[in-house]
């Protein structure tokens, strides 16, 4: 069965401007500017009330198109959170015997991992565009990844995690690696 028209609206907070041009949504806020392309979705985007509300419509949509409405709104909310608060992922080093040695290079945009499982090989991971990496000052063996785009921050964390993958061993026993321990925003809610 097809629904004739399904729509959902979302509020746009103060201090954030949203522009829509041919299914490309641009969100600008105090932390910067993010753009997302929704051309692959069969949806209509329009701004209401002088740019204070965003409405997403689906005409004659199937179940999959109806689900895409909420997905698109969630993506735009992630963009708004990114340009207002920013995203922060924390990663911890886990090792049983050989301490993992990590050094941050390229002005906080790359990390070199040494002594993983006692190996001599140096593993280098470049962060994706707009993501910075720091060693935590308060907690030992912790990395902090900061950025505005949640997808780039989480993918950078995944790249670090995958570089420290234990091969040819039982991963239930060899738990060494760098794992995500906390996900949140840079500016905490008061």
Curated annotation (Swiss-Prot):
- Cellular component GO terms, alphabetically? cytosolic large ribosomal subunit
SUPFAM superfamilies documented for this protein: Ribosomal protein L6
Entry keyword set: Ribonucleoprotein, Ribosomal protein
The Gene Ontology biological process terms listed for this entry are: cytoplasmic translation
User: Which Pfam families would you find in this protein's record?
Assistant: Ribosomal_L6 (PF00347)
Q: Which GO terms describe its molecular function?
A: rRNA binding; structural constituent of ribosome
InterPro entries, per database record:
Ribosomal_uL6-like (IPR000702), Ribosomal_uL6-like_a/b-dom_sf (IPR036789), Ribosomal_uL6_a/b-dom (IPR020040), Ribosomal_uL6_CS2 (IPR002359)
**Keyword Ligase tagged:** no
PANTHER family according to UniProt: 60S RIBOSOMAL PROTEIN L9, 60S/50S RIBOSOMAL PROTEIN L6/L9
UniProt record similarity statement: Belongs to the universal ribosomal protein uL6 family.
Name of the protein:
Large ribosomal subunit protein uL6
Question: What organism does this protein naturally occur in?
Answer: Oryza sativa subsp. japonica (Rice)
Q: What is the lineage of its organism?
A: Eukaryota, Viridiplantae, Streptophyta, Embryophyta, Tracheophyta
């Amino acid at each position: 069965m097809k629904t004739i028209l399904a729509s959902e609206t979302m509020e746009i907070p103060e201090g954030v401007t949203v522009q829509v041009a041919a299914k490309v949504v641009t969100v600008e806020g105090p932390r910067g500017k993010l753009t997302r392309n929704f051309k692959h979705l069969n949806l209509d985007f329009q701004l209401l009330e002088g740019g204070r509300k965003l409405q997403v419509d689906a005409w004659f949509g199937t179940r999959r198109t109806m689900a895409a409405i909420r997905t698109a709104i969630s993506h735009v909310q992630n963009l708004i959170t990114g340009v207002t608060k920013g995203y922060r992922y924390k990663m911890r080093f886990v090792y049983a015997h050989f301490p993992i040695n990590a050094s941050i290079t390229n002005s906080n945009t790359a990390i070199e991992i040494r002594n993983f499982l006692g190996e001599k090989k140096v593993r280098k991971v470049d962060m994706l565009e707009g993501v910075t990496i720091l060693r935590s000052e308060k907690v030992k063996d912790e990395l902090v990844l900061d950025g505005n785009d949640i997808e780039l921050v989480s993918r950078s964390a995944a790249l670090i995690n995958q570089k420290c993958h234990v091969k040819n061993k039982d991963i239930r026993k060899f738990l060494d690696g760098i794992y995500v321990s906390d996900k949140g925003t840079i500016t905490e809610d008061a």
